[in-house]
């Protein structure tokens, strides 16, 4: 059993990551699964806004669950979707998308597989 209690075994603080307008807290799943999965709490950096760049992620699995605040993503062929507390989303591998905007109090959980993956900027659809 791996237990992320925030008291020292796992990272109990937020750090920078993929996007400059977010902070990330590693929940220890990457280490516990030897890189097969990653789970992070992601929160907005107040005053920093999304850079709505179209991109894809090269991974097998990506899901988000909104804890507080809201976030709007735009997905190719589906348009804009706003996620609010309690919303969960499974993003299919390789779907072209971009974050449009988010609230300053946004906090979500993201689970990916594998833990490390490539993000590629792509042309607008």
Set out the residue ranges of the language-model regions.
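A short, N-terminal "cap"/entry segment at the start of jelly-roll beta-barrel domains
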Residues: 1-46, 120-125
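A short hydrophobic beta-strand segment most commonly corresponding to one strand
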Residues: 37-40, 90-91, 103-121
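Short, conserved beta-strand element in jelly-roll/cupin
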Residues: 41-46, 56-73, 111-114
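Short beta-strand segments in beta-sandwich/barrel cores
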Residues: 50, 69-74, 88-89
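Short acidic-glycine-tyrosine-enriched beta hairpin
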Residues: 77-94
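Short, surface-exposed secondary-structure boundary micro-motifs
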Residues: 94-95, 100
């Amino acid at each position: 059993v791996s237990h992320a209690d925030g008291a020292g075994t796992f990272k109990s603080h937020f750090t920078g990551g993929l996007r400059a307008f977010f902070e990330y807290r590693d929940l220890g799943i990457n280490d516990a699964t030897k890189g097969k999965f990653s789970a992070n709490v992601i929160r907005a950096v107040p005053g920093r806004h999304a850079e709505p760049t179209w991109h894809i992620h090269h991974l097998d699995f990506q899901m988000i669950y909104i804890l507080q605040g809201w976030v709007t993503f735009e997905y190719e062929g589906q348009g804009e979707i706003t996620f609010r507390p309690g919303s969960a989303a499974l993003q299919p591998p390789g779907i072209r998308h971009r974050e449009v905007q988010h609230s300053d109090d946004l906090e979500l959980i993201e689970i990916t597989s594998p833990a490390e993956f490539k993000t590629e900027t792509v042309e607008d659809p």
